[in-house]
């Protein structure tokens, strides 16, 4: 298994209480695929440096996880299909 960091920018029109269940729904893909979620850090509503889908701000969330590459690819695909997700970025952080 490899370590990944996933950044998700969600639609700012979402209610605060619906953000966590939405992210948990995505993370079920990782858990079902045998991966493990180490940390979920929701930063809240932040201003974007440029508009994405005509939205000037978004709800940022950073997820640290360990999973196989195919599982992370499926997670990214599921997120991109959801209309509440403005942008995703999957990174493999450097080990120090």
From Swiss-Prot:
HAMAP family to which the protein is assigned, alphabetical: Ribosomal_bS6
Name of the coding gene: rpsF
NCBIfam families found in the cross-reference section: S6 (TIGR00166)
Pfam families according to UniProt: Ribosomal_S6 (PF01250)
Source organism per UniProt: Streptomyces coelicolor (strain ATCC BAA-471 / A3(2) / M145)
Example of a GO biological process term: translation
Keyword field: Ribonucleoprotein, Ribosomal protein, RNA-binding, rRNA-binding
A GO molecular-function annotation: small ribosomal subunit rRNA binding
Organism classification: Bacteria, Bacillati, Actinomycetota, Actinomycetes, Kitasatosporales
The protein, known as: Small ribosomal subunit protein bS6
Assigned protein family: Belongs to the bacterial ribosomal protein bS6 family.
Function: Binds together with bS18 to 16S ribosomal RNA.
């Amino acid at each position: 298994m490899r370590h990944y960091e996933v950044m998700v920018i969600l639609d700012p029109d979402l209610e605060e209480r619906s953000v966590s269940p939405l992210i948990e729904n995505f993370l079920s893909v990782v858990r079902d695929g045998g991966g493990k979620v180490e940390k979920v850090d929701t930063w809240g509503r932040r201003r974007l440096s440029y508009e994405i889908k005509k939205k000037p701000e978004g709800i940022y969330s950073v997820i640290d996880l360990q999973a196989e590459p195919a599982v992370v690819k499926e997670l990214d695909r599921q997120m991109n299909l959801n209309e509440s997700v403005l942008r995703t970025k999957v990174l493999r952080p450097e080990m120090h």
